[in-house]
Amino acid sequence: MATFKEMLKASMKSKDTEEWLDVYFTRPIGLVFTLLWKRLGVHPTVITILGMILGAAAGWMFWHSELEYNIWGVVLMMLSNFCDSTDGQLARLTGKKTLVGRVLDGFSADVTFFCVYFALSMRMMTELIPGTDVTWGPWIWVMAFMAGIMSHSPQCLLSDYYRQIHLFFLKGKEGSELDKSEEQWRIFREQPKKALFFRAFYYNYAKYCATQERRTKNFQLMMAEATNRYGAPLNLPAARSEERRVGKECV
């Protein structure tokens, strides 16, 4: 029977793509929940949806200025974060990894942070700008747009892509989720006209992949050159592949 430490390692994508806090705090606690959900036969997608609900509830708590509401908001946000950790760990331990689950996981995070940004903006509209006697008013929405849409969202998109690049060279195609937009567009076009859900799903995922590729032009050139020279990126000589894995010249 595997030890807790062995199961923790198996439940991670790779230790060097995990943040320090996740390795020593979030993931171990998440694994405890994972083992509970596994015993109860809960599917990872259910955990993802639960995390989204908890995140939205946290946003509602942050709408209020009272301390007790804010404390509950922090607690709910932490539980949402544990769910965000647990769904992936459960999927890797049980082999229930799906593209729908991956996309839903990202959507869950988007819903959570939208609710938090929206709630804090609504709350701060009537609060004073620090050091002045002027309220934030509609200007807080400008701040939220710059922080959430122009900064936070692109950062999440690229951090996910860089993580998948690293896993691609570390574990190969099977150990990563580095998808090409060209392939996703092909799958989208193959969906029946009446399959509205799947057409919408693959359309949005193809756009997501295309945005990642558009923002990493040097990496796309490197992948094309590796394919032309060696037949496939994973055929890179070991020394060059290691350089890519640790991040040299790849983006």
Question: Model features per residue range: what roles?
Answer:
Residues 55-58, 113, 151, 155-156:
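Alpha-helical transmembrane segments of multipass membrane proteins
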Residues 77-83, 145-156:
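Alpha-helical transmembrane segments of multi-pass membrane proteins
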